[in-house]
Curated annotation (Swiss-Prot):
HAMAP family: PRAI
The keyword Hydrolase is assigned to this record: no
Reactions that this protein is recorded to catalyse: N-(5-phospho-beta-D-ribosyl)anthranilate = 1-(2-carboxyphenylamino)-1-deoxy-D-ribulose 5-phosphate
Name used for this protein in its record: N-(5'-phosphoribosyl)anthranilate isomerase
GO MF annotation list: phosphoribosylanthranilate isomerase activity
Pfam families registered for this protein in UniProt: PRAI
One GO-annotated biological process of the protein: L-tryptophan biosynthetic process
EC number: 5.3.1.24
Catalytic class of the enzyme: isomerase
């Protein structure tokens, strides 16, 4: 590539402890995610997320993740947590996603067999700030810890995209080189158990992403 500088953004998702949030900031992570999807084992209450928000470093985005939540549930999180970005993982349509007047990412299920078309995505969600490609099947949730075939990511996207699904310190270097994403999103790959992050794996994940960034420029 002709760039003199290349930097993949990093999002740590499924945060449940203030100490993990604080370490994410120290490691230079760009965003932390709180999950409000009802069926998630990493779900936190809005009041819990608000308390953890105090540990977030300046210039780190706060992402609120939803999956088929009601509008009132989303609004409660907006009032209580004050996220900077929303992320929708369910069957939410464009009208629902844009109704909160907030930038949002739309998660795209890559666990099925149906081909994903860039033009179709951009027509379906024209106001999306970007897309997140995850390994869950249509109708399922994220955080599976299983990767999908990165070659299935559609070409021709005119919006930034994040790569998710089964990423960990062992494979994120290859993932970045294979897909050149705007960002990577990890949850289970840096955990001891759901919601409990491992400091060593968090640090190693960041180091591997930065190593990949340097390799892109070679």
């Amino acid at each position: 590539m002709s760039r003199s500088y290349y930097r993949t953004r990093i999002k740590f998702c499924g945060m449940t402890r203030a100490g993990d949030v604080r370490l994410a900031g120290e490691l230079g992570v760009d965003a932390v995610g709180f999950i409000f999807a009802r069926e998630s084992s990493r779900r936190v209450a809005p009041a819990e997320a608000r308390a953890m928000r105090q540990a977030i470093a300046p210039m780190v985005d706060v992402v609120a993740l939803f999956r088929n939540n009601s509008k009132e549930e989303v609004r409660e999180v907006l009032r209580t947590v004050r996220p900077t970005l929303l992320q929708f993982h369910g069957e939410e349509d464009e009208s629902f996603c844009r109704s909160f007047n907030m930038p949002y990412l739309k998660a795209i299920a890559m666990g099925g067999r149906e081909e994903v078309n860039a033009r179709t995505l951009q027509l379906r969600y024209p106001s999306a700030a970007g897309f997140l490609f995850d390994s869950h099947a249509p109708g399922g949730g994220g955080g599976t810890g299983v990767a999908f075939d990165w070659g299935r990511i559609p070409t021709g996207l005119h919006r930034p995209f994040l790569l998710a699904g089964g990423l960990n310190p062992e494979n994120v270097y290859d993932a970045v080189l294979a897909t050149l994403p705007w960002g990577v999103d990890v949850s289970s790959g840096i955990e001891l158990e759901p919601g409990i992050k491992d400091g060593y794996r968090m640090r190693t994940f960041v180091e591997e992403v930065r190593r990949a960034d340097c390799t892109v420029l070679e």
